[in-house]
Every structure is written in C-alpha cells, then in structure tokens.
C-alpha cells in the first residue's frame, strides 16, 4: 500500500504559513508596546527635560499607540505594520546615531538596561512585522 507523503507535508506548510502571519503581527504588536513602554519610562525618568529628545520619546510612544490601534483591525493591519516598521527602524537608527556623533545635542554614553530593552523591542518589531507582511503576500 503506497501513500503519498507530499500531501500531509503540503497541508502542514499551508497551515504554518496561514498561522505565521497572525502570530508575527501579534508578536510584533507586543514588541511595539514594549518599545512604547520603554520610551515613556525613559521620558519620565530621564528625558523629560532634554530638549528635542524628550518630546521625541513622547512622539514615539504616541505613534506606537496609533499603530497598535491600526494593527487591531484587519483592514488597516498591513499599513499599520509598515508604520510600525518605520517607527521602530527610525528609533533604532536614532539610538545608534546618539552613540556616535549625537542626535539633536544628545550623546548617549554607556549601555544601560533601558537601552538594551529598546534595541531588542525595536529590532524585534521590525523583523516580526516585516515577516508578517511577507507571509501575508504569499
């Protein structure tokens, strides 16, 4: 009795792909929320009085909240995912620049826990939201 092993394998790949995009969207949203939390905490603890940087931390958190609202609706999810990628990539690039020449007069020194958390949440959000968009278009 011969059986074809390609049918179950094909079915499992399809199921994995169909489940992959929603999971990537959800995890990307979770990382975006973490990014906003880090920015709010750092604004309150350290950057409330720093010209330009403090307001940019608040702007990041507000943009993330709007993006999370967009990710909650299926119709706006792809655009919101793209916005989340841009927000996180810009935040990560800004952090990197602040370690070099500085950003708007602020130069980051040392490697603190909030910096590590920001890097993890921002890079993770970019990767997962891009993955969600890629899986969606297949």
Q: Predicted regions: what is each one?
A:
Residues 2-138:
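Membrane-interface extramembranous regions
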